[in-house]
Regions:
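P-loop NTPase catalytic core of nucleic-acid-dependent motor ATPases
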Residues: 1-62, 131-134, 160-164, 168
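Short beta-strand segments
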Residues: 13-16, 67-68, 110-113
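Helical mechanochemical/support elements of P-loop NTPase systems and associated helical scaffolds
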Residues: 21, 25, 56, 67, ...
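Substrate-gripping "pore-loop 1 plus following alpha2 helix"
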Residues: 39-53, 80-99, 142-148
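AAA+/SF3 P-loop NTPase mechanochemical coupling elements
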Residues: 55-62, 93-113
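Conserved AAA+/SF3 P-loop NTPase catalytic/coupling segment centered on the Walker-B
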Residues: 62-88, 101, 119-126
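Conserved nucleotide-binding/hydrolysis micro-motifs of P-loop NTPases
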Residues: 72-73, 114-118, 136-141
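Phosphate-sensing "switch" segment of ASCE/P-loop ATPases
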Residues: 103-108, 122-168
């Protein structure tokens, strides 16, 4: 997410039951990236009656990381839209009350959810983009560190160094 490169053409799905660190992970990365991180509604990624590009995507133009929280169980992904978003396609949209513009999404998309959304298509084009990252461990109330987010935020400079090494 640091580079602005989407050459991997991926949608990263953080999947697992609750109380396992998905939100903590996303929140820390959001803090690390600051203004380069944007949150999107789950409705941005799910299939609706219309497949048009709306103002929700225009808001994501400058984002290096796009975080989406929770889809409803059984909701289907908007597969064509996800292919466009992750593929670097030139999209046309307009901000609310604004003029039309052309843009590409340069951010990596992370969906944190308890249940895998429905993917109806069987073609390689969508399935090669889906990168599921399992969060298999569930922490009981006694095991949870309620201050973990604060502790990790205090270590952002070290986390940034680690992330930069990963980019090189």
């Amino acid at each position: 997410s640091l580079t602005g490169s989407t050459s991997e053409q991926c949608l990263f799905i953080l999947i697992g039951d609750g109380a396992n660190g998905k939100s903590t992970f996303i929140n820390v990365i959001n803090k690390l990236l600051g203004d380069y991180s944007k949150a999107a509604s789950s409705q941005t990624l799910v299939a609706k009656g219309s497949s048009s590009i709306g103002d929700d995507l225009v808001d994501l133009v400058s984002a290096r990381l796009i975080s989406v929280s929770e889809t409803e169980a059984g909701e289907a992904l908007a597969e064509a839209k996800i292919k466009q978003m992750t593929g670097g396609d030139v999209l046309k949209g307009r901000p609310l009350y604004g003029s039309w513009l052309e843009f590409s999404i340069i951010g990596k998309i992370f969906l944190a959810t308890n249940s895998l959304p429905q993917i109806n298509n069987t073609d390689h084009g969508i399935w090669r983009r889906i990168q599921a990252i399992p969060f298999n461990r569930t922490f009981t109330a006694e095991q949870q560190d309620k201050d973990l987010g604060i502790k990790l935020t205090a270590e952002l400079s070290g986390i940034l160094n680690w992330a930069i090494k990963g980019c090189l």
